[in-house]
């Protein structure tokens, strides 16, 4: 299930050699938030992983699958009411076979998640 342009939209993206920054807008009216959790919407961790995967694929231009989640830390809840526009910062390294991704989800200095993932 693709979440882009439904659950979230990319408002701005900047890229340099290794760093890729995506400013997104969460859709607070999406049906996922009605279930997770009614009256207190929180972005599910699985959706955060999927958003990172979609951004990695958009950046690389390749259809990739998550091979390994080396480290996934959720440090604070991402709520569409309090943080409607989080920033995803991705550092992508390609060794020819795999894409090692270090990602942070944040809003200013507040860090919501840190992820170390490998895609093939």
Named regions from a protein language model:
Residues 17-21, 47, 85-87, 100:
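Intrinsic-disorder/low-complexity, polar/charged segments enriched in Ser/Thr/Lys/Arg/Asp/Glu/Gln
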Residues 16, 91-120:
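HotDog/MaoC-like acyl-thioester-processing domains
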Residues 53-91, 98-99:
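Hydrophobic beta-strand-centered segment that forms part of the acyl-chain substrate-binding groove
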Residues 39-44, 48-49, 53:
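Compact, glycine-rich, soluble single-domain proteins
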Residues 2-43:
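Catalytic strand-loop segment that frames the active site of acyl-thioester-processing enzymes
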